[in-house]
Structures are given as C-alpha cells and as structure tokens.
Amino acid sequence: VLGDERMGVGVAVAPRAVLTAHYLVLGASSVHVAAFDGRERAVREAAVDHETGFALLHLDGPELRPSPLAPTGRLPAGAPVFLLTCQDENERKGASGHVMVVGPFEAFWEYMLDQAIMTTVVNPGLAGAPLFDAQGLLVGIVSLGLSAVGRYSLAIPIDLFLERREEMESGARSPDRPFRAWVGFYPQAFDGGVAVTGLVSGGPADKAGLTRGDLLLSVDGTAVGSLRDLYTALWRKGPGDTVGFQVLRESAILVVEVIAGDREDFYK
C-alpha cells in the first residue's frame, strides 16, 4: 500500500535525531537521510510510534542544528504558520497559511488524535514537512494533505513528541502507558454508521473473518456510530484480548470475535 520506495522530509530535533511522519519509514528495510549540506547520514535506528504517527530517526555522522520546539497550546485559529519541504534533495520549498483549528481527528487506519493542527497551508512537496509558527518555532509535522475534503493539510502537534520523547530516544516504552488493541482493518464513517472498507492481510481481523462491507454496529456491546466511538471502545482492550464486533453482513446480524494484536509487533 505504501510502496517499495518512499521519499519524505523531516526536521532535526536533536543534533543526531530527525523527526518525520512514521509511514515514510514503516516496514522499511533501510532508511537513508540526506541533510541540507548534501551529505548523507547513516540511520542507526528508526523509532516508530504508531499512536502519534511520528518516527524519530537516530543518525550517525556530523551533528545537525536542531529546531527549537513550541507546544501548540498557544496556537489559536487564524495564527500564521509555514512549512518547509522539497521534492528532491537538491531543492527547498516553503508555503504559508493559517491555522484553521486545533481539534480532534480520526483516520481509517486505526488512528485518532485528540488535538491535530488543521491548516490552510498547501504542501508543495513531500510529506513529513516541519510546520513552524511565525517565530520560527516547530509546532508540528505535516502528515496529510486533505484538500479533497476541504482542508489543505494536517499536522501532528509537537506536543505529542514532547510527551513521548524519552521513550522514542531510549527505545523503552513507559510502563505507565497501556497497550492498545489493534485488529488491522480500515473502517470508514458515513451517515449510516461505520463500515469495514478493507483489511490488513494476515492481520487479526482478517484471520477472524471480518469482511469488507461489514457494517459495524457495536464493540463488546457498546454501540458505535463514528470512528471516535469505534476506537474509544476498541482501545479499552489490549493485545491478546478478545474483541466482539457485532456486524450487519448483507441481511444478517452476527458477532465476530477477534483476538487483538499489537501493531508494533506486526510491523517489525
């Protein structure tokens, strides 16, 4: 789905660490980084956080100058922002706009944020672009272009990296953070509810018998009418737990029990 070769951009957040969008390196057998000086840095390790959507690339080689970070709590609607990106390693592009809203966001790959940055900035280059405020402080990483649905770009707030920074730098998950159930499906919300539009081949939902076109009615007895309802109910469970999905399939209502997996383990 993501392709055999992917290109993106990132931003230095430490002398030997670059932050980018996680799907750019997800499942990659090798990752290469070319810095602004044209010199390649070897990637020693890529720390991927599926919950936030960030990847932190740990580099060897000459140090980079890290960008100063700023929490997004002071980003009101209308605040000016700009991004920096490129389409290849020999160019740099910029674009500016304004914050539309900082608010909830849900996506079909079992992904949900309580606070995402929606902006009017049109990204003229690759994903993973750093988003800055008017003072040049890093406030987010541009993950998606959403012009097809009336929004130009979405950025993951840097606040989430600050919360997970110690874990991503050390590679050790905090014992205080619960594991989330993952079933490997692609649900889409519409006026009548939530439907399964695809499955991860070999994932828990695929193995359990959920099928494309199933209309999801409830999760463990909790009715779901939106992606937020669905993920909130699903994430009450953890890997190894059984999750009961009540579905409408053609004209029949049935319950499909799925043994939840761990997304991080699946994509290692």
What are these regions (language model features)?
Residues 3-8, 12-93, 115-116, 125, ...:
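Conserved active-site neighborhood of the chymotrypsin/trypsin-like protease fold
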Residues 9-11, 70-74, 130, 204-215, ...:
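A short glycine-leucine-enriched loop at secondary-structure breakpoints
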Residues 14-22, 139, 205-227:
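Conserved PDZ fold ligand-binding element
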Residues 18-21, 74-87, 127-148, 167, ...:
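Active-site-proximal beta-strands of protease catalytic cores
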Residues 42, 169-173, 177, 195, ...:
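PDZ-domain C-terminal substructure recognizer with occasional recognition of PDZ-binding tails
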Residues 46-53, 102-117, 172-180, 186-193:
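Gly/Ser-enriched beta-turn/beta-hairpin loop segments
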Residues 67-114, 147-153, 165-178:
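Flexible, gly/ser-rich surface segments that form the specificity/activation loops bordering the active-site cleft
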Residues 83, 134, 138-191, 242, ...:
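C-terminal cap/linker of serine protease catalytic domains
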